[in-house]
A protein has these predicted regions:
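Phosphate-handling DNA/RNA-contact segment within nucleic-acid enzymes
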Residues: 1-115
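Acidic beta-strand-to-loop metal/phosphate-binding motif
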Residues: 72, 118-131
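Short hydrophobic alpha-helical runs that function as membrane-insertion/retention elements
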Residues: 95-98, 119-123, 146
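Short, acidic/turn-prone active-site loops that include or flank metal/cofactor-
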Residues: 99-104, 124-128, 150-152
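Short, surface-exposed amphipathic charged segments that create phosphate/polyanion-binding patches used
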Residues: 110-116, 155-171
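Switch/connector loops and helix/strand junctions flanking conserved nucleotide-binding motifs
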Residues: 129-132, 156-158
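Short, aromatic/basic amphipathic alpha-helical patches
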Residues: 131-142
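A charged alpha-helical hairpin associated with nucleic-acid processing machineries
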Residues: 144-151, 167-187
């Protein structure tokens, strides 16, 4: 497993980890072990001492009254990919965070508000249409909200080329209404 610490207010409060094998290999292995009663490999293993719905991965990168825009993604690898591909390491105005899944909680919203964030870009995976809509409705009363519309629903941020990521942020940032209309038209 590759292990990542979860840091909140400068303190390590937990960890998330992901197996180094690709999902397909884990699934193949687990299908074989199912009948033998052997150990099943988990793709993700997280610490259990914290409620992850109250935390944001990379939250300490959001600077109080300095970070105007936050890109909200699902997981750790999304944040790493966005930070690397958009070169956000030393950018005080934009940061990427993860909600550890496809939901955003009231506590996570409050954390972003408390740092003075004004704009949130929802960067959930392309296959998470309903989750994006729900998150947008939850965020809209507090922030200016945009959705990063990933054209290929089967790809995550780490699978997209740098030029594709820049293209999404240059040409495919949609308002909540534009996103909903687009998804209705695609049906």
């Amino acid at each position: 497993y590759v292990i990542f610490p979860v840091i909140d207010c400068g303190m390590v409060v937990g960890y998330v980890s992901r197996h180094t094998w690709p999902k397909e290999e884990i699934d193949t292995y687990n299908r074989k072990t199912k009948y033998k009663g052997e150990y099943k490999i988990l793709r993700y293993r997280n610490s259990t001492e914290n409620d992850f719905s109250k935390l944001l991965y990379n939250y300490d990168a959001v600077r109080k009254d300095g970070t105007d825009t936050v890109i909200v993604a699902e997981g750790v690898f999304d944040v790493i990919a966005l930070t690397r591909k958009l070169e956000l390491y030393d950018n005080p105005h934009i940061a990427a965070v993860a909600t550890f899944g496809k939901k955003i909680s009231d506590v996570q919203i409050y954390k972003l508000q408390s740092k003075g964030v004004r704009t949130v870009v929802i960067g959930y995976d392309g296959d998470a249409v309903e989750a994006v809509k729900r998150a947008a409705e939850r965020l809209r009363p507090y922030f200016e909200v945009f959705i990063a519309d990933i054209a290929d629903a089967d790809k995550d941020w780490d699978e997209l080329a740098e030029t594709e990521v820049y293209g999404i942020f240059a040409y495919r940032l949609l308002s909540v209404l534009e996103y909903k209309l687009k998804k209705v038209q695609e049906r």
